[in-house]
Amino acid sequence: MFGDFMEGRQSRRASRELLEAQKAAIEQLFEADLTYLRETFAGTPMTLQSEPFPDYPGAVWMGDIGVRAFSVTQDVEVEQFPVYVNLVVVGRERVGPRQFVRDGSTHTLFSSADHYSGKKVSLLTNDVELVRSVSASGFNPPPPWLAWYELGALIYNLQGDAQYWYENVWDRYWESLSLAEQDAFIEGQRSSIDAYLSEEEWAEWLEAIRTRDARYRERLRNEYLKDGDDAAS
């Protein structure tokens, strides 16, 4: 019983520490103190938190720290960054260096930073239409053969920043796509890689990236079994 009490106490302490870390992170990210953020979004209906959004890039309700808004974060290619910014800016009034408002009560704070050959963009917003527009626009992080070109395609024993990026940036995007959408993405990239990747290198990258996805490995397995059945017959 005492052990359960201590575990519960440690869990509550960890939760408090996580909450404090979230508060500090959001203040730093949007360069605004928590009181201001809470006041800005105070008029947001609590029912908004149940709005459904696609899994990628996802929208996290920040009500746990008293901010009635969604946090949206994703990495995009540098070439896509102006398009992303325009989604935020067009049709909204700029009321601060990072803040925009629509219809008087729909607020958006925007932040961006260079991040592994791309841009990490973040929103704090109660604008459901904007969240849906961002989700529907199909923004993607820079592909691994650009973001980590110097490491090559041997990515089976990653560590440090590269491991973090693959697991938390790339995989999160890549696994949000269907296999057909992955096929289309790769086909769209094919014409731009000739200047720096040979056919053999390109094939190595594709094998390394695609086999990270369990669905693709299952597809390969099914194709192998089918070929075996066809050969037997």
Residue ranges and their predicted role:
Residues 2-233:
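Polar/charged low-complexity regulatory segments
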